UniProtKB/Swiss-Prot annotation:
Source organism phylogeny: Bacteria, Bacillati, Mycoplasmatota, Mycoplasmoidales, Mycoplasmoidaceae
Protein name as annotated: Ribosome-binding factor A
Subunit structure: Monomer. Binds 30S ribosomal subunits, but not 50S ribosomal subunits or 70S ribosomes.
Family according to the record: Belongs to the RbfA family.
Cellular component, GO annotation: cytosol
Organism: Ureaplasma parvum serovar 3 (strain ATCC 700970)
Length: 116
């Protein structure tokens, strides 16, 4: 297992490279809407789970689909910066943290209203 500092550094590198590529080097207008919010590497560094968000939450499935279409290009951009032995497989998922936080906020508002 890689040490925590190294893993954190590699996760940060992946986030920076993918965000930069999506913003500046991808021609797909829908994929450009995505931004990386977090990256989690597997223990053996072979898989990177990349959490995506977009300004328009209702279009996230289409954004995810288009990002997956350009994943090979994104992986090659990452390979140019990668310092470890093998570039990880990229797995893109929708980051549901914002939706969850909004749900919790709504619950707190309901509780506050019931107290008043």
């Amino acid at each position: 297992m890689a040490n925590e500092v190294r893993v954190a550094r590699l996760e940060s590198l992946i986030k920076d490279v993918i965000n930069n590529a999506l913003a500046n080097e991808i021609n797909d207008k829908i994929a450009k809407l995505a931004r990386v919010t977090a990256v989690r590497l597997s223990n053996d560094l072979s898989v990177a789970k990349i959490f995506l968000d977009a300004h328009k939450r209702e279009s996230m499935l289409k954004v995810l689909e288009n990002v997956n279409k350009v994943s090979g290009l994104l992986r090659s951009k990452l390979a140019a910066e990668w310092t470890s032995y093998k570039v990880p497989e990229l797995r893109f998922v929708i980051d549901e943290t914002i939706d969850y936080a909004n749900h919790i906020d709504e619950l707190f508002k309901k509780i506050k209203q019931q107290e008043n």
